[in-house]
């Protein structure tokens, strides 16, 4: 006879991220019952627990996970949802370490580009890399995130800018699921930069995206969303809208890099198209925030890029709070402006640099990060959700944000399986 539950986790403190009036959505003493990869019950009384213990294949007793002396009271670990990094560019060729040295020696962006650096240097190296090379390096990068309890990662293309390489990047991203205990959400970011072959004709490149690249990628099912870098050094509002309109024709939700370097009104346009998220948003003005409320768009903060580029304009966190706009936090892991392979460090940065609270930061890597990807089945410990869970040897969830590179989970469950 089959067991009622596949796994039961008990003797843990649970930061559920539910909105129950408790910090971090802490639950009273509760056991989590898992069946077929999902949370199917939250058991809060001894009678329920005793019954469940007799009907479960695998039992995890949290009080046995943290070593203690014989006469000491066992320390109960904290259980949180698996983390979600909702904005990365971790599939690419080469690196930009040499460019980093040049920057520190005073070289300008133009000088670096003239020497073959910058985003076009990464495009060249990515185009030259075969699929296996891209996969091998992407596995190493994604593994760093997974080691911190990340169980879902968004991965963008955008370093190919031609059809073949963009397809190769997205295929590599999807295949990470075969090698690591992680869910991958892919985003087509063809409108990331203007490739050399279009000779400064951005409109012609947008024609190419809408006529050739996006239809092929959509037909192959390689993209879960479409993104655009809408900025003075990226693409205009009109060009961005053309890509958004095309994405909608293929049933793909949109996201946007906006207001990183200027107030381009990209956030308002993204909201018009019901964007899942607007990312960066350092130059977002207060008067544009109501449009995000109306479209239920998530504001994604990327403190790694802010730090790495020595930016000074901070995102309008107070105004976002005042309007109850959900705030997510991500690494923006990329070779040029945020080579950051640590979501926990990004959470610390979001507090130190942008003044989020630790709870806001942790919700930004769980509940709100899930919303930024259009996923309503994770990011919160609740019945019906995917059993992506992490266990930590900490006294309070705030420790995960407060301590830089100080914690790794003592256990991770992906789709209910202990990995």
Curated annotation (Swiss-Prot):
UniProt cross-references to Gene3D superfamilies, sorted A to Z: Metal-dependent hydrolases, Urease, subunit C, domain 1
Localisation per UniProt entry: Cytoplasm
Membrane-spanning residues: none
Swiss-Prot/TrEMBL keywords: Cytoplasm, Histidine metabolism, Hydrolase, Iron, Metal-binding, Zinc
GO molecular function, one term: zinc ion binding
Binding site for Zn(2+): 87, 89, 257, 332
Enzyme class name: hydrolase
Pathway connected to this protein: Amino-acid degradation; L-histidine degradation into L-glutamate; N-formimidoyl-L-glutamate from L-histidine: step 3/3
Known cofactor(s): Zn(2+); Fe(3+)
Residues the entry annotates as binding Fe(3+): 87, 89, 257, 332
SUPFAM superfamilies: Composite domain of metallo-dependent hydrolases (SSF51338), Metallo-dependent hydrolases (SSF51556)
Ubl conjugation keyword on record: no
Chief location category: cytoplasm
Residue positions binding 4-imidazolone-5-propanoate: 96, 159, 192, 260, 337
Cofactor remark: Binds 1 zinc or iron ion per subunit.
Family: Belongs to the metallo-dependent hydrolases superfamily. HutI family.
Protein name in UniProt: Imidazolonepropionase
Organism of this sequence: Alteromonas mediterranea (strain DSM 17117 / CIP 110805 / LMG 28347 / Deep ecotype)
Origin organism lineage: Bacteria, Pseudomonadati, Pseudomonadota, Gammaproteobacteria, Alteromonadales
């Amino acid at each position: 006879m089959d067991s009622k539950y596949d796994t039961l986790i008990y003797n843990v403190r649970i930061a559920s991220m539910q909105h129950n009036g408790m910090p971090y959505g802490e639950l009273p003493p509760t056991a989590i019952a898992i069946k077929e990869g999902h949370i199917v019950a939250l058991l809060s009384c001894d009678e329920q627990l005793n019954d469940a213990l007799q009907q479960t294949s695998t039992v995890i007793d949290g009080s046995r996970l943290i070593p203690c002396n014989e006469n000491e009271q066992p320390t109960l670990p904290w259980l949180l949802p698996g983390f979600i990094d909702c904005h990365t560019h971790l599939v690419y060729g080469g690196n930009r370490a040499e460019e980093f040295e040049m920057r520190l020696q005073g070289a300008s962006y133009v000088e670096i580009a003239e020497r073959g650096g910058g985003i076009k240097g990464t495009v060249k190296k990515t185009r030259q890399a075969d699929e296996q090379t891209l996969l091998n390096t992407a596995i190493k990068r994604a593994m760093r995130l997974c080691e911190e309890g990340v169980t879902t990662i968004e991965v963008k293309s955008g370093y190919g800018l031609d059809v073949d390489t963009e397809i190769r990047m997205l295929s590599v991203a999807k295949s990470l699921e075969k090698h690591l205990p992680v869910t991958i959400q892919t985003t087509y970011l063809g409108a990331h930069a203007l490739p050399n072959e279009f000779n400064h004709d951005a409109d012609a490149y947008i024609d190419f995206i809408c006529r050739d690249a996006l239809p092929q990628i959509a037909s192959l099912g390689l993209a879960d969303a479409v993104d655009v870098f809408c900025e003075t050094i990226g693409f205009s509002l009109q060009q961005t809208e053309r890509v958004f309109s095309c994405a909608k024709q293929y049933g793909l939700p949109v996201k946007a890099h906006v207001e990183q370097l200027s107030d381009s009104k990209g956030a308002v346009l993204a909201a018009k198209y019901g964007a899942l998220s607007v990312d960066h948003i350092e130059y977002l003005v207060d008067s544009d925030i109501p449009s995000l409320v109306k479209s239920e768009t998530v504001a994604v903060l990327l403190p790694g890029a802010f730090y790495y580029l020595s930016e000074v304009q901070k995102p309008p966190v107070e105004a976002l709070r005042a309007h109850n706009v959900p705030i997510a936090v991500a690494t923006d892991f990329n070779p040029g402006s945020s080579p950051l392979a640590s979501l926990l460090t990004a959470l610390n940065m979001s507090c130190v640099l942008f003044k989020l609270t630790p709870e806001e930061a942790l919700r930004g890597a769980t509940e709100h990060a899930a919303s930024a990807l259009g996923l309503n089945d994770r990011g919160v410990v609740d019945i019906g959700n995917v059993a992506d869970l992490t266990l930590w040897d900490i006294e309070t969830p705030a420790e995960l944000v407060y301590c830089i590179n100080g914690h790794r989970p003592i256990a991770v469950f992906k789709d209910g399986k202990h990995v």
